[in-house]
């Protein structure tokens, strides 16, 4: 025993020290395995036999579970042959781009034992990309005066391949005027240059078309082409020419600034840029430049300022036209000024009401406007209007006076300021006009409620958060100004109790930050919802509401709790009995535990911490089932002890321990000496149980007396003499219908029959049939024929007769434990779940005697049986219906002894079959219940 424990300790130390020793000796670490494949391999193509290269046997592959571990799995492992297969498209250009070396690194994992191997797959490039130019056609313009030897760089072709498969050379089709040279950028990319070999002549060839080809180094090589279109441009050898040498024009003095006067035009026989002409004033005084403007591109001449006949009656303008080659032409323009209406009206604003409230009604007077014109007659008549705004109009109040009024609703949030252009025009021909801009500021009123950025909010908060921590922030905006736009936040409603909400959360009135007032507990409160309000400071104040849902996340803050085995008064576990002839895999007992947490934190696992005989028992990792791992040996002790740890799935995990005491015995008589040696103190709850039994008995007696008193008062208050007929000698009845009471206050209505025999002192109170639904009241008569007639109208047509009342159905066996659930020596040997317990008459009588003895000894604390009063140191074994097949759930670990939730075998009674147990056993069970 000591030698085996020493070897186990040495193995544990080696498992701990092995990773550190391997890190000290890098040569001992696994070597990376490299493969080389071309890109674009078909799916399921074999890269290599990974199992063979790793030194793994094909027979061990199912147990080792060799697989690929990578973020994107381009490869997979055949579980049968161990071949490394291609599982996805491998495009070298997409994965590695232009890198010269493309390597896919990934890990492979093997279990039992767990090993990680490092694999590198070198992806070789194939010539799967054609060189391509950015443009299918390249347009160039070259002047005919360009000197030979001039170079013209061209855009390079693009080839996604690398190495020999990438772009290698360019070539140009045969021609007389151009040659091709290859250049290289600092980063190594090749690009072509076009070289002019001979001088160009536009009159001989105005257009040249070439074909440029890019070729890669693949086998076979691939190529791409583009067309080069060269247009020969002309040289500047012709000057501009005006259509006229002298231009004459007449202007009225009242023409406004910007008025079109004349457009001069010059032509050039050259082409392209050499034919572009610019116009400018030539040798003119500053007065001409002050009153006239010349467009240098179009030759348009416009007035620059108001003309006045009294200042100058004519102007002479000299214009020069010049091309890019400095070849020029000149002309002159004679401008004569005619006297006319040259006084524009004036606009004067006398008063302006600003700022203007945005809730001003239509027709509100804003300003008074006065107009004035120094001309007379029709030229002095002025018309005034507002330009470009439909919300304001001018109303004439008297001659030359106008009122500016509103003509629509205003909204400061839409337009906070208006720039109104008021124009006055006289009646001259052509008319003159002037304008003035009136700026109106719109003042704010509280006409907008706050608006939240989201329609609803949801936040996740982990439980056990620090009190005072911020868990969310809401934000609402109000387009109003000043106090009307200042928003404050508050909590107005919640699905919690009104007094509890302030103890859970609060909100900052200024920032909208929601704070936790206490630490949340996921087990008590998983989610709650708040209604938050944003309210501005306007008068009257406007508000808006939004919902905030808080989800409390679970943390691993609850340790597992062991439900079985239950601890005795001294804290020790109960005993379980195991047959000596138990085969390996025999279900001994089951450790049942629960965890108050949820999700992964409630996944429980069971582990053996200590065993008096290692290797004798095995423990289910997820089920908690304790089974025999081997048969009981001659040297194994009859009493065994297991220390079991229950851990949850949290990080870090929490755990609880339970101690199992197991006794190998074939009968109850063999267990008694072991149990008698282990005298336990009396149960501290025995006195409390005694008081509860006494209280229950008193309540039952009081209830029974109340029922008798109610029946007596009912009979005494009855005014009908025939209600006493049933108590006369013989059963008599009264003609006419009586009322059969329908007792339906519970979940199922019952029918009752109370009859008093004429020559007997017994009263039979028979529970008849359970009616599936409420039935109408029937007549109560005492003769047999009438009674049978009334009962035939009962629920669902259930027959009711005297022989039916006397016949009793066999007891339902659903209450019995299955063979796997019974304590004692039954174990799992008998597969009949309907068998009775105990198995023989001797065990039954012995067990009844022990129950009576332990019950009497529990009252004075002298019980010698382990496990507390009435337990006899034995515990019910849990059957295989608790086997955890899928993800563990703590609800599957809970079993309530005596509950019919896990008892099956109700089909035997439905089919009319008698239970498997004998009549003798049924009677003994009835005795136990009475005792």
From Swiss-Prot:
Glycosylated position list: 419, 545
Gene3D superfamilies assigned to the protein according to its UniProt record, in alphabetical order: Cadherins
The membrane topology term of the UniProt record is: Single-pass type I membrane protein
Q: What is its main location?
A: membrane
Q: Where is the composition biased (Basic residues)?
A: 921-931
Alphabetical GO CC annotations of the entry are: plasma membrane
Extracellular face of the membrane: 31-691
**Cross-referenced PANTHER family, in alphabetical order?**
CADHERIN-87A, PROTOCADHERIN GAMMA-B2
Name the chain's protein. Protocadherin gamma-B2
